[in-house]
Amino acid sequence: FVCMRLCSIQDNRFAYRKNVLPTSMHPSQAALIVSLAKPYLKETAQIMDPFCGVGTLLIERAHLVPAREIYATDTYGDAITMGRENAAFAKTRINFIHRDFFDFRHDYKFDELITDMPVRNRQTKAEMELFYERFFDKAAEHLVSGGIIVMYSNEIGFVKKQIRLRVEYRLLQETCILDK
C-alpha cells in the first residue's frame, strides 16, 4: 500500500478566478456540475446564466463544451465587473449584462440556461415559491423548443413543484451534490 501526498504539484486549472464574492460557487463545484450535465450540453449552443455572479459556472461550461454565444445577467453590478475580469483571465467570451433576469429581453432564444439559483435568506417560503414560479415562466420565454435548464438549487421542492405543474418541462436528471 503506497500513499503519496501530492501537495507540491501546482494546479493552475482554476487560476482564472481572480475575483470572488461570498456567494460565489467554487470552481471545482461548477466544473462538477457541468461535467454531470455534459450528456445534455451541445456544441455551439447559445447559453445564458440568469444569476451569473462572477461567471464561474459559465466559464466552466465553456471550458467543457464550446459554445456559440454566452450571456450572463445579474443585478449586482460588482459581480458583473468581477465576472468580466474572470472571463478575460479565462480567455472566455461572455456578454455580461447588469440587469435583472426578469426584465431581460433578447432577440433570439437560448439552447441552455445554466445557473446557481439564489439561496433563500430572509425570504419566506411563499416568496421563494413565487420566485421559482417567475423563474420557470421567464425561462420558458427564453428557451428554444427542446432547450435545457442546468440548475443548481438547494430548493428541490420548489423546482419539482414547478416541473410538475408545467407540461413544457420534464426532469431529465437529478443529482444530489451535498446532502446535509
Walk through the language-model features, giving the residues of each.
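Class I S-adenosyl-L-methionine-dependent methyltransferase catalytic core
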Residues: 1-180
